[in-house]
Structure formats: structure tokens, C-alpha cells
């Protein structure tokens, strides 16, 4: 039986906005400045903070696939921006861990359809499975913390183009593509997963054709802000003077 779950939104998601401007198609121009149009600016919503209060800003995208034999294939992409860095840092970590048993038998399930999932805008999350006893999840998290010291920089390989890792478990590939960053896993005989962030959207998809797999896609935004400074007496005085002008019609 084919079970499908999909969710779409039509508003530009904040994570996609962050990487969309930082990931033009050529790998050599990953951090070239990109001007936002008036239409894009008109869609921005939320609260704003002064740049001096931002200690660090980071976007993480990770995918892992564990098959029935315990073999794990995956990747993690970290984009980090902080005050003392001249340019953003974009690192990739590829994972291929052996299991405690031979590779599982290829699944015989077929996942059909779903071509329209690649044509959506905004946020698209889908999990489709034609196997049994599988567990899969797509997740998005946003965390805002307060502090003075930024978290340590993540390790990994700087992303200067496509990176890939292949083995008996399958293939994992991280690729800048069309203004977005794609993280794709092709698990041998078990299915495939994809995350794509940028170009105005976020896509998370899982298609399972085998059995007893554990698949996770996660995109996370983390911001650290300085604690709000104490009130400036001169600023409070100016504010009181402005309030006093209200009865006069100003």
C-alpha cells in the first residue's frame, strides 16, 4: 500500500530566504551579494533587531539514512555567519558508517507518482513509502538564544562544488543547484531522500521502497543575540519629550 503525506505553503520561508541569497548557481559565487527585489521585501514579516545585537547566525541541513543492517549514510551542511568573520563559512560533513550485518536485501516496493512535488513553491514536505516497518521524518526548527560568545565553528570540508560519497550502502551527494543547495541520498535498494534549500523554497522528501529503514531530514535555523543593554538615560529623556508632543498633534 502506498501512503503519502505532503504539506505545502505559499509564503517564502525564512530558511530559504537565508540561503537563497547566498547560493547562486555557480559554486565559485556561493557568497556573491544578491539584491532583494521590492516584491521580496514586501513579503518580509516579523520583528527586527539591530545588527550589533547579532552574535552569530547559522543554518544547518542534515539527512541520515539507516538501513535494516545498521549501516548509516548521510550528510550535514553548516552555514555560519558571525561578527568576527569576513565571510560566511559553509562546511559539509559526509557520513558512511558500517553496520553489524551484511547489506539488506533490496526492497521490491514501488513508489509511484509524486512528480508534482518538485514543482511547488515555499515549503514542501513529503514521505512516501511502499515498504514495511519504516520510520521517516521531515523536520524544521528555529532557535533564538541569548549570549555573548558564539558557538564553536563546525568542522567539515568547505563547499566549493559538488561533494559525493559512495559505498555499498548507497550514495550521498551535496550539490549547489539552481540557486539552491541540495542534499540527496540514494540508498541501495531501499529508496531515496532529498533536501533542497534556497531559490525561494524548502523541499524535504523521502521515498521508501525497502523495509526497516530509519530516515531523518532536518533543517535548523539558530540565532544568538546579545542580551538587551540597559536603558540609556538620554534615550529615555528623548522618548519622554516625544510622548509630550502627542497632545499637540505630532
Swiss-Prot record:
Subcellular localization(s) per the UniProt record: Fimbrium; Secreted
Keyword annotations from UniProtKB, A to Z: Amyloid, Cell adhesion, Fimbrium, Secreted, Signal
Transmembrane spans: none
GO cellular-component term (any): pilus
Reported phenotype of the disruption mutant: Deletion of the entire fapA-fapF six-gene locus shows no visible growth phenotype.
Predominant cellular place of this UniProt entry's protein: other
Signal peptide range in chain numbering: 1-27
GO annotation terms (biological process): amyloid fibril formation; cell adhesion
Record note on quaternary structure: A minor component of purified amyloid fibrils. Fibrils are resistant to boiling in 2% (weight/vol) SDS and require >90% (vol/vol) formic acid to dissolve.
Family from the record: Belongs to the FapE family.
Described function: A minor component of the functional amyloid in this bacterium. Upon overexpression of the endogenous six-gene locus (fapA-fapF), cells form large clumps during liquid growth, make large amounts of biofilm and produce amyloid fibrils.
The protein's name in its UniProt record: Functional amyloid sbunit FapE
Gene source species: Pseudomonas aeruginosa (strain ATCC 15692 / DSM 22644 / CIP 104116 / JCM 14847 / LMG 12228 / 1C / PRS 101 / PAO1)
Amino acid at each position: 500500500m502506498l501512503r503519502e503525506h505532503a504539506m505545502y505553503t505559499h509564503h517564502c520561508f525564512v530558511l530559504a530566504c537565508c540561503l537563497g541569497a547566498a547560493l547562486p548557481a555557480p559554486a565559485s559565487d556561493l557568497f556573491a551579494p544578491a539584491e532583494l527585489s521590492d516584491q521580496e521585501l514586501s513579503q518580509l514579516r516579523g520583528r527586527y533587531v539591530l545588527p550589533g545585537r547579532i552574535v552569530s547566525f547559522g543554518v544547518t541541513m542534515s539527512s541520515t539514512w539507516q538501513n535494516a543492517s545498521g549501516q548509516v549514510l548521510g550528510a550535514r551542511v553548516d552555514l555560519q555567519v558571525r561578527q568576527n568573520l569576513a565571510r560566511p563559512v559553509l562546511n559539509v560533513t559526509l557520513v558512511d558508517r558500517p553496520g553489524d550485518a551484511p547489506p539488506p536485501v533490496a526492497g521490491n516496493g514501488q513508489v509511484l507518482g509524486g512528480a508534482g512535488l518538485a514543482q511547488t513553491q515555499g515549503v514542501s514536505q513529503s514521505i512516501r513509502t511502499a515498504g514495511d516497518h519504516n520510520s521517516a521524518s521531515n523536520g524544521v526548527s528555529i532557535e533564538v538564544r541569548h549570549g555573548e560568545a558564539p558557538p564553536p565553528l563546525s568542522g567539515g570540508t568547505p563547499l566549493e562544488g559538488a561533494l559525493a560519497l559512495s559505498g555499498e550502502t548507497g550514495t550521498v551527494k551535496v550539490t549547489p543547484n539552481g540557486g539552491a543547495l541540495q542534499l540527496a541520498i540514494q540508498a541501495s535498494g531501499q529508496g531515496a531522500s532529498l533536501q533542497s534549500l534556497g531559490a525561494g523554497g524548502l523541499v524535504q522528501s523521502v521515498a521508501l521502497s525497502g523495509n526497516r529503514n530509519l530516515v531523518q531530514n532536518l533543517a535548523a535555523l539558530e540565532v544568538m543575540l546579545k542580551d538587551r543593554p540597559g536603558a540609556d538615560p538620554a534615550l529615555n529623556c528623548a522618548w519622554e519629550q516625544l510622548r509630550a508632543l502627542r497632545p499637540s498633534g505630532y
